[in-house]
Design a protein with these regions (language model features):
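Acidic (Asp/Glu)-rich catalytic clusters
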Residues: 66-67, 91-96, 115-125, 146-154, ...
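Active-site pocket-lining/capping segments in soluble small-molecule metabolic enzymes
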Residues: 65-66, 79-81, 162, 172-202, ...
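Hydrophobic faces of well-ordered beta-strands that scaffold small-molecule active sites
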Residues: 71-78, 99-103, 128-132, 157-159, ...
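Cysteine-cluster motifs in flexible loop/terminal segments that predominantly coordinate metals
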Residues: 1-55
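Short, acidic/polar
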Residues: 81-94, 139-147, 205-215, 294-303
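Active-site-adjacent beta->alpha loops and helix N-cap segments on the catalytic face
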Residues: 84-85, 107-121, 137-145, 163-187, ...
Length: 346
């Protein structure tokens, strides 16, 4: 399979396989005060157009005896950037309550490279998932990082285009966007890496999202990580449409974890993420918001894990404004309760 490199004119992220997950509710672009160019299209670009600069794609050959599988519980690892000691102590705290830890690639802070993060997490006794975004790396840098990850063989790589950097965050730094998430997934798969990809089911243009996830599967992804959907009916509708379009790979559904105003606001500020108003009120007005937040997350996780096609859940969010330790303890408790409900022993 050859992956098209023919960009859609007018996209500031120079995407071929858009739209990104940051399209606003009114159809406007995340980065410019103009309509998203993909929101005005009737369909997606053709995936199999070749050319001299095309990226080879396709599902990698599984090595004999390969034990890779999607995690049932994937927990966000949120720690201060560049702090290896805190990262590893937090990873150790969380390792027994989940199957893998996901570390982000953020637009507003400089952290270790993903390959270094993967080694630090693995050395702490946890299974790493690392996010690799196209925002801050040109194609050569992306290839270098993927080769380092492939050499170590430690991590699943979540390939994303990346959210645009805010106007007041490092205005002296350029944004690359040489590739988008689909083309990056093809490149990663061609190097034999286990590839995860993201999709936002509720972002405009909603009708194009299921097929876009299938394109990423065809590029070589093994699992889709979905942004939060405020209700199982909406998620089921998306998954039905995706399967009708050819989706075969499993998905990981997002569970929002918040226990106070700040952690709720941090989630709400993420592009394409929506928290049901009743869920927010239930947690924030409770006598014990921490327990209410934990219980709500456990209930959502168990509900999602019972859905057809959902292989796992991602415990996503800041969790608590009281610091890294408090947040990790909340995440760990959620993971333990979900495992207990599924009959998994510590």
């Amino acid at each position: 399979m050859q992956i098209s490199q023919e960009r859609v004119s007018g996209c500031p992220k120079r995407m071929v396989f858009g739209p990104c997950g940051g399209v606003h509710d009114d159809g406007s672009c995340e980065m410019l005060p103009t309509p998203c160019v993909f929101d005005q299209l009737d369909g997606l670009p053709v995936a199999t157009v070749g050319g001299p600069d095309a990226v080879a794609g396709g599902r990698p050959v599984e090595p004999p005896g390969s034990a890779w599988r999607p995690p049932t519980i994937l927990t966000d690892l949120s720690v201060p950037p560049g702090d290896a000691a805190t990262l590893q102590s937090t990873a150790r705290l969380l390792a027994g309550s989940c199957d893998a830890l996901l570390v982000g690639d953020h637009q507003d802070r400089v952290d270790f490279p993903p390959s270094t993060l993967a080694r630090l997490i693995a050395d702490a006794g946890a299974v790493p998932w690392v996010t690799l975004a196209c925002r801050d790396r040109n194609r050569i840098s992306l290839e270098q990082e993927l080769r380092a990850l492939a050499l170590d063989g430690l991590a699943t790589v979540l390939c994303v285009t990346g959210d645009g950097r805010a106007y007041d965050v490092r205005p002296d730094v350029t944004q690359a966007f040489d590739l988008d998430g689909t083309r990056l997934a093809a490149l990663a798969a061609s190097l034999g890496l286990p590839v995860a990809v993201a999709e936002t089911p509720t972002a405009r243009p909603v009708a194009l999202r299921p097929r876009r996830l299938v394109y990423k599967q065809e590029a070589g992804a093994r699992v889709g990580a979905l942004n939060h959907v405020p209700g199982t009916a909406l998620l089921a509708e998306f998954l039905d449409a995706a399967r009708a379009a050819g989706l075969r790979m499993p998905v990981i559904a997002s569970v929002v974890v918040f226990t106070d105003q700040r952690s709720a606001d941090a989630l709400a500020a993420l592009p394409g993420l929506e928290i049901a108003a009743e869920r927010r009120e239930l947690v924030l007005t409770a006598d014990d918001p921490v327990e209410a937040g934990i219980a709500a997350a456990v209930d959502e996780a168990n509900l999602l894990l019972g859905m057809h096609g959902v292989a796992g859940v991602n415990l996503s969010g800041l969790a608590s404004a009281d610091g890294v330790q408090a947040a990790a303890e909340i995440q760990a408790e959620i993971g333990r309760r979900v495992r207990e409900a599924r009959g998994v022993r510590p």
